[in-house]
From Swiss-Prot:
Glycans are attached at N45, N824. It catalyses: Ca(2+)(in) + 3 Na(+)(out) = Ca(2+)(out) + 3 Na(+)(in). It comes from Mus musculus (Mouse). GO terms for molecular function: calcium:monoatomic cation antiporter activity; calcium:monoatomic cation antiporter activity involved in regulation of postsynaptic cytosolic calcium ion concentration; calcium:sodium antiporter activity; calmodulin binding; metal ion binding. It is found in: Cell membrane; Perikaryon; Cell projection, Dendrite; Cell projection, Dendritic spine. The cytoplasmic Calx-beta domains bind the regulatory Ca(2+). The first Calx-beta domain can bind up to four Ca(2+) ions. The second domain can bind another two Ca(2+) ions that are essential for calcium-regulated ion exchange. This is Sodium/calcium exchanger 3. The gene is Slc8a3. Pfam families: Calx-beta (PF03160), Na_Ca_ex (PF01699), Na_Ca_ex_C (PF16494). It is a multi-pass membrane protein. Keywords: Antiport, Calcium, Calcium transport, Calmodulin-binding, Cell junction, Cell membrane, Cell projection, Cytoplasm, Endoplasmic reticulum, Glycoprotein, Ion transport, Membrane, Metal-binding, Mitochondrion, Mitochondrion outer membrane, Repeat, Signal, Sodium, Sodium transport, Synapse, Transmembrane, Transmembrane helix, Transport. Disruption phenotype: Mice appear grossly normal, are viable and fertile, but display muscle fiber necrosis; this affects less than 10% of all fibers. Muscle fibers from flexor digitorum brevis show lack of calcium exchange activity, and very slow return of cytoplasmic Ca(2+) to baseline levels after stimulation with caffeine, a stimulus that triggers release of Ca(2+) stores from the sarcoplasmic reticulum. Mutant mice display decreased endurance and perform poorly on the rota-rod test or when hanging from a taut wire, indicating poor coordination and increased fatigue.
């Protein structure tokens, strides 16, 4: 991702701007102090000015001497600033491991046994963690661990005395998340596109708790017991965390009062997600796929199964055709794997994934999607499953599985599978089938077929074939249908001595047709004059090779005779016998001929030549034995007269069947001093090395990953999942971060203890780094005369939130919905208060209560920041809610003017928050 490459520079420039801003305020404060003006009555100079006397940190000692000269002070500021950025980078990398362990933990499944009403039992797997619960607990902890641990470490490390750094970082981080991250996500969506929150009820619950958390923080600071945090206040703050999680879970599961509300969702039990079922949007504000004040007036709607099957079929054909066009040499299994990679790269992902992806691509660790391509290809192959209620206990359901089939025109025949499910499988069952025309016609495109499938006792599925007719005419893809009918069960003869009454009381085995009972077969046409291409775009040869052979491939059809001109073009390697012999001419491909070879002599002059290159290029191919009708349709003279509709269609199809150049019309030949046949092995190794999974299996894998440079780049740059070379930026960032990557490779792999070992060790390391960051930030602030509250709000909050910013931006661009990009912002803000401040203050309040004293917390600056943030958060959430109206379409994106206005508003709110919080800290405006 190109924007990720600017992350360190962007972070540095923004930090520099913030430093300049705060130093400007310091100059104003110093000028006011020199003139004898008192900024605010009733407040002493010590509380209104930043102290230049640094205090001992939790880990870092004081840098002596304490009163350095101006030059030494500038040097110290630079050292502290660079160290802060480097420590933030280290926290991002260990947070990558931490989030990977959370992904492993939250994706765990367990087996459950389900007992059906008829007494049968079946075993299935379900996710242990609910998505909403994991987002508000482990996911929030993973993204906010530095802020939470900083608050706890600051209190415990300074003798259980309240500090400004931890709480101010939490409030400042909340402001940055709410205003800057959401503002960026609004802006980066392409003009005219929108993203909306899907689970709006959960978002409302977390947003309400987010605002309540900061209102509650103000109440315990300035209302209940001003300046003192009592034990019950700290414990109640901490107790609000599980209450928030519980209510969000209730909203997600639609329990309590939610179950009485109108449901317009279909729940996918297998994936645990909610899918909207209605697309009509009347005027108003949309909420969870339902318009407010709207009602379901009638029951006439298109069945979901039909829509999904049709859309899935079209999407599958489009992906396979595109991939086959780009990679005609690939076999079907490779195309399926590439298609699965494409689907994986475009599906909705968790916030943890984007956080890990952003960090790894920023640090030269590569694209983790390329690791999952093979595994996802297997997992996604069994996604078509019909969920219908059992008609009766003793009825067998008969249907196609799958219901969509694709085949090439020259395949000969296509196999279709009929499945029976449930009922008594000890009986023989019969079901008739018959082909029906679609855009494909029986006798011309396929063989008309009808017959009866016999499922013998114990058989649950049976295959039958339909012949496909191959012709020499290039035509568009066509489809036909196969319909099941007249399902029946072979009944046994009446047993001797059995009374009719007894026979009638027995539940006779019966069978019914279930959906889908109609299969769609799509014929992918392969009649084409051919696509002509080299095997690759670059080849390395040794100068001692003598005569090199270059293959020209003819793929995706081999109809007719085609001539392909070619020539060599000089680069740094010169022709005419200096480095190679010039070559030019024409290749003539006969009918059904698929490969031709170009021979070029390479001159061996015994010189050390590295990266000398030249190019072999093909020109436009032309048909030789074109039919008269096709030649007339494609001739220039035909444009002088108006064609009939039939001639226009025939001309269009003829144009599509013309020979064309493929993916590699040019071949760059690089002449080196030596050449070894290892390109295939290298590609295989690179593919293996690119398999960067979120989880790790061994320490060896982690250390290999830590010292390996892999290419970043956008997922859309290479839909096949194949490797490109690392850029200069990838190498630079790798060498800058290799210390952290090797150090954190010592963390236990995520496979150990189901991720919990990695979880515990990672959070301990994050805590240690956070303690160092707190000391660096405090020493940085005191060196330039900043208060801890200002340093926390401006610098620490910014540094801890930068990785989340880039992760949210990636999620906003790549996800269909806005949940992964901004849906978790409000939840994280609430968790920061309940865990970060609640835990730290509970520990401190209990400690001082055991000493018979009270835990004192200064309410001034923190209470003012909390109040200011709460007001601005109301404005932000109101704007987001208004943006769900139909003329805007969603929280993110929209028309360019609306995007700019929203982004500028949110950024302005953050700048105003920073300005007012800083002015209040230095007593330029009166706080509480």
């Amino acid at each position: 991702m190109a924007w990720l490459r600017l992350q360190p520079l962007t972070s540095a420039f923004l930090h520099f701007g913030l430093v300049t801003f705060v130093l400007f305020l310091n100059c104003l404060r110093a000028e006011a102090g020199d003139s004898g003006d008192v900024p605010s009555a009733g407040q002493n100079n010590e509380s209104c000015s930043g102290s230049s006397d640094c205090k001992e940190g939790v880990i870092l000692p004081i840098w002596y001497p304490e009163n350095p000269s101006l030059g030494d002070k500038i040097a110290r500021v630079i050292v502290y600033f660079v160290a802060l950025i480097y420590m933030f980078l280290g926290v991002s990398i260990i947070a990558d491991r931490f989030m990977a362990s959370i992904e492993v933990i939250t994706s765990q499944e367990r087996e459950v046994t389900i007992k059906k009403p008829n007494g049968e039992t079946s075993t299935t797997t379900i996710r242990v963690w609910n998505e909403t619960v994991s987002n508000l607990t482990l996911m929030a902890l993973g993204s906010s661990a530095p802020e939470i641990l900083l608050s706890l470490i600051e209190v415990c490390g300074h003798g259980f005395i309240a500090g400004d750094l931890g709480p101010s970082t939490i409030v400042g981080s909340a402001a940055f998340n709410m205003f800057i991250i959401i503002g960026i996500c609004v802006y980066v969506i392409p003009d005219g596109e929108t993203r909306k929150i899907k689970h709006l009820r959960v978002f409302f619950v977390t947003a309400a708790w987010s605002i309540f958390a900061y209102i509650w923080l103000y109440m315990i600071l300035a209302v209940f017991s001003p300046g003192v945090v009592q034990v019950w206040e700290g414990l109640l703050t901490l107790f609000f965390f599980p209450v928030c999680v519980l209510l969000a879970w209730v909203a997600d599961k639609r329990l309590l009062f939610y179950k009485y509300m109108h449901k317009k969702y279909r729940t996918d039990k297998h994936r645990g997600i909610i899918i909207e079922t209605e697309g009509d949007h009347p005027k108003g504000i949309e909420m969870d796929g339902k318009m407010m004040n709207s009602h379901f007036l009638d029951g006439n709607f298109t069945p979901l199964e039909g829509k999904e099957v049709d859309e899935s079929r079209r999407e599958m054909i489009r992906i396979l055709k595109d991939l086959k066009q780009k990679h005609p040499e690939k076999d079907l299994d490779q195309l399926v794997e590439m298609a699965n990679y494409y689907a994986l790269s475009h599906q909705q992902k968790s916030r943890a994934f984007y956080r890990i992806q952003a960090t790894r691509m920023m640090t030269g660790a590569g694209n983790i999607l390329k690791k999952h391509a093979a595994e996802q290809a297997k997992k996604t192959s069994s996604m078509s499953e019909v969920h219908t209620d059992e008609p009766e206990d003793f009825a067998s359901k008969v249907f196609f599985d799958p219901c969509s089939y694709q085949c090439l025109e020259n395949c000969g025949a296509v196999l279709l599978t009929v499945v029976r499910k449930g009922g008594d499988i000890s009986k023989t069952m019969y079901v008739d089938y018959k082909t029906e025309d679609g855009s494909a016609n029986a006798g011309a495109d396929y063989e008309f077929t009808e017959g009866t499938v016999v499922l013998k006792p114990g058989e649950t599925q049976k295959e039958f074939s339909v012949g496909i007719i191959d012709d020499d005419i290039f035509e568009e893809d066509e489809h036909f249908f196969v319909r099941l009918s007249n399902v029946r069960v072979e009944e046994e003869q009446l047993a001797e001595g059995m009374l009719p009454a007894i026979l009638n009381s027995l539940p006779l085995p019966r069978a019914v047709l279930a959906s889908p009972c109609v299969a769609t077969v799509t014929i992918l046409d392969d009649d084409h004059a051919g696509i002509f291409t080299f095997e690759c775009d670059t080849i390395h040869v040794s100068e001692s090779i003598g005569v090199m052979e270059v293959k020209v491939l003819r793929t995706s059809g081999a109809r007719g005779t085609v001539i392909v001109p070619f020539r060599t073009v000089e680069g740094t390697a010169k022709g005419g016998g200096e480095d190679f012999e010039d070559a030019y001419g024409e290749l003539e491909f006969k009918n059904d001929e698929t490969v031709k070879t170009i021979h070029i002599k390479v001159i061996d002059d015994k010189a050390y030549e590295k990266n000398k290159n030249y190019v072999i290029e093909m020109m436009g191919p032309r048909m030789v034995d074109m039919s008269v009708q096709k030649a007339l349709l494609l001739s220039p003279e035909v444009t002088d007269r108006k064609l009939t509709v039939e001639e226009e269609e025939a001309k269009r199809i003829a144009e599509m069947g013309k020979p064309v150049l493929g993916e590699h019309p040019k071949l760059e030949v690089i002449i080196e001093e030596s050449y070894e046949f290892k390109s295939t092995v290298d590609k295989l190794i690179k593919k293996t090395n690119l398999a960067l999974v979120v989880g790790t299996h061994s320490w060896r894998d982690q250390f290999m990953e830590a010292i390996t440079v892999s290419a970043g780049g956008d997922e859309d740059e290479d839909e096949s999942g194949e490797e490109r070379l690392p850029s200069c930026f990838d190498y630079v960032m790798h060498f800058l971060t290799v210390f952290w990557k090797v150090l954190f490779a010592c963390v236990p792999p995520t496979e150990y203890c189901h991720g919990w070992a990695c979880f515990v060790v990672s959070i301990l390391i994050i805590g240690m780094l956070t303690a160092i960051i707190g000391d660096l930030a405090s020493h940085f602030g005191c060196t330039i005369g900043l208060k801890d509250s200002v340093t926390a709000v401006v610098f620490v909050a910014f540094g801890t939130s930068v990785p989340d910013t880039f992760a949210s931006k990636a999620a906003a661009l790549q996800d269909v919905y806005a949940d992964a990009s901004i849906g978790n912002v409000t939840g994280s803000n609430a968790v920061n208060v309940f865990l970060g401040i609640g835990l730290a203050w509970s520990v401190a309040a209990i400690y001082w209560a055991m000493q018979g004293q009270e835990f004192h917390v200064s309410a001034g600056t923190l209470a003012f920041s909390v109040t200011l943030f709460t007001i601005f958060a109301f404005v932000c959430l109101s704007v987001l809610l208004y943006r769900r109206r139909p003329h805007l379409g969603g929280e993110l994106g929209g028309p360019r003017g609306c995007k700019l206005a929203t982004t500028w508003l949110f950024v302005s709110l953050w700048l105003l928050y920073i300005l007012f919080a800083t002015l209040e800290a230095y007593c330029y405006i009166k706080g509480f």
